[in-house]
């Protein structure tokens, strides 16, 4: 709700917006950045579900000050655990490198900003030992090169399923904006007129046919869903 965000941006003393592109859906990033830039709010993008996607031709994660991409087991690239940070801001990347556990060996980092970016940061930044090891990096490199092919394959499957579901009675497809280049690694739809019992029956019937679906909104957290009371 970008109207709500615009109101909050001028009434709340926020410095950073952590934006999660949940389940691969990208909002109007042009308008969001206009709101946040106007209010002096830095944007950090959680691109765990949009790695390989884009908004208006700009890759997901390239709008904000920094982006995080997960490479956990169930993401678009799989190294078991871990992830990738990207930014054009040398201060942010210098801090990330020292935080990751570089000690004073930051100059060995092949993607590091110039040494002067570390001059002040190295004195005030703790070492939390969150670095990626070479084995995970080696596992990810061929997957990164293969990502465009994977995105095209997922999208073909996504659109086939979307076509099959469209016009199904009681089911509402999530329409995607023209500006959004999707990564169709998962698909969502709504059952707005169904009761909880009816939704549970749909899940059970689909599971019996080998189609495993997750219900976001159920009383009990299951699988990828979570709940915090």
What kind of region is each of these model predictions?
Residues 1-79, 84-92:
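Active-site phosphate-binding strand-loop segment of PLP-dependent enzymes
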Residues 22, 144, 192-193:
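Conserved donor-binding loops in enzymes that form glycosidic bonds
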Residues 50-56, 63-186, 223:
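Active-site region of PLP-dependent enzymes
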Residues 4, 31, 91, 149, ...:
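An acidic, carboxylate-rich microenvironment
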Residues 41, 170-171, 211-212:
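Short aromatic/hydrophobic-glycine micro-motifs
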Residues 174-229:
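Conserved PLP-binding catalytic core of the aspartate aminotransferase-like
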């Amino acid at each position: 709700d970008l109207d709500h965000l615009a109101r909050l941006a001028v009434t709340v003393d926020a410095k950073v917006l952590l934006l999660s592109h949940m389940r691969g859906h990208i909002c109007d990033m042009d308008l969001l950045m206009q709101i946040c830039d106007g209010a002096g709010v830095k944007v950090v993008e959680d691109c765990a579900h949009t790695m390989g996607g884009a908004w208006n031709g700009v890759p997901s994660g390239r709008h904000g000050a920094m982006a995080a991409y997960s490479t956990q087991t169930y993401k678009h690239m799989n190294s078991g655990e871990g992830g990738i940070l990207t930014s054009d801001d040398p201060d942010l990347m210098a801090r990330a490198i020292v935080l990751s556990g570089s000690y004073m060996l930051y100059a060995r980092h092949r993607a590091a900003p110039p040494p002067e970016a570390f001059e002040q940061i190295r004195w005030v930044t703790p070492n939390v030992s969150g670095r990626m090891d070479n084995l995970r990096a080696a596992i990810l490199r061929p997957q990164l090169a293969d990502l465009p092919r994977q995105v095209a394959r997922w999208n073909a499957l996504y659109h086939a399923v979307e076509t099959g579901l469209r016009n199904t009675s009681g089911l509402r497809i999530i329409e995607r904006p023209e500006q959004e280049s999707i990564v169709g690694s998962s698909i969502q739809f709504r059952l707005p007129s169904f009761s909880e019992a009816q939704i549970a029956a749909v899940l059970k019937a689909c599971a019996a046919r080998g189609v495993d679906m997750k219900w976001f909104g159920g009383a009990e957290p299951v699988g990828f869903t979570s709940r915090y009371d």
